[in-house]
Amino acid sequence: GSEMCIRDSMAGVYSDMAVTGIGRMACGVEAAADLRLAYRWSLSLAASGGRYKYIRNPRVTVISDVDNSAVDTRAESHMGGCTLGAAPQLTACAELSYFGPRGWGFRASAGYAGLRYVEPVPLRRTARIARQGGITREMFDAFTHQERLGDAFTFDASLFKSFYFGRSRLTASLMLRNLLGDADTVYSGYESLRVRRIRSGDALYFAPHATRYTYAYPRSFYLTISYKF
């Protein structure tokens, strides 16, 4: 289970929320290979595929911080079948390395992450939120649908130079991350706990707040120096 302090937008009070009976399932396969292409060239490959999901509906209890009254007690949250948002379900990467004379070398790599989803929130999938707030089918789906993130691609490169002192080694590396400079790549996301109130004349409607996203770093450069002895 889990506990947290929240602002319950539907009740209009700060509350403590406890979620119990969370069930998760994770399974997958992975494979990797290192290939020696030539005396100074090598290629590393790796891929994985998995299924990470919630396997049952947890129970949500919300207690008001104002007077310790129960806002919602052991409400069923329809999260069964939702996907965990912490990891992509498909990944692949390849790295080409060159080790030149006098300690020079470089690496170039490409990565892919797919079947990614935002982290679902139990509160908005309870009947109090999804059915009371989602008075139309479209709005109900907005509260309960889990958003899928776009596939992500990365391209990186590094140039390095090693200096040897007996059994010791000093290595200076210049690393270039996100060579394509794609600043719109979403790294992760999670659903908001908040609910928007929308007034239209005398009618009051509810809608979920927008998903919170974390974006990958834009094109970046790093200079590192390491010493092994």
Task: Please identify what each model-predicted range represents.
Residues 1-6:
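Short, small-residue-biased leader/transition segments that mark boundaries at the very start
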Residues 7-17, 57-80, 122-143, 189-210:
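Solvent-exposed loop segments that connect transmembrane elements
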Residues 12-124, 226:
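Gram-negative outer-membrane beta-barrel transporters
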Residues 20-22, 85, 148, 211-214:
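Alpha-helix initiation/capping motif
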Residues 23-27, 86-92, 151-155, 168, ...:
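Residues that define the transmembrane beta-barrel architecture of outer-membrane proteins
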Residues 38-40, 150, 165-167:
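A cross-taxa feature marking solvent-exposed loop/turn segments within ectodomains of secreted
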Residues 85-164, 188-189:
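C-terminal beta-barrel architecture of Gram-negative outer-membrane proteins
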Residues 112-130, 161-229:
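C-terminal beta-signal and adjacent terminal beta-strands/loops
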